Amino acid sequence: MKISKSSAWDQGRIFSFLSENTIPVRLAVIQDKHPLICSVWFSVDAETLEISCVSHGKSQLVKSLMADPRVGFEIALNDPPYKGVRGKGNAKLTQENVSNTLHEVIVRFLGSTNSNLARWLLGRAEE
């Protein structure tokens, strides 16, 4: 992630915010010439601040990104004081490490892989 020179936060503060809060990333993509907003669980790399998400291969999100990889994103608190991270970029779609990334985001957002939802999501990892 490239940090704007005018940003109030440095890389360390951005990583702290992203790793300490379990707020889904809101992705804005283009679908059929109209904006589509999706909330998606994510993980973040401490060194690069690269955000990794997992979505089913047949999802509208993936179909939209295959047609146009440009995204806008926001990871922000819903309550005052409002703060967060937002930006734009290009999504990179890959099937590498899908199971590992899925496991990581499930544990991050659900706390474990023991719930029915977690088992259902993990069961669809190869689809």
Regions found by a protein language model. Name each.
Residues 61-88, 92:
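Helix-adjacent hinge/juxtasegments
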Residues 22-57, 71-75, 85-86:
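Short beta-strand segments
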Residues 2-26:
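Short, basic/aromatic recognition patches
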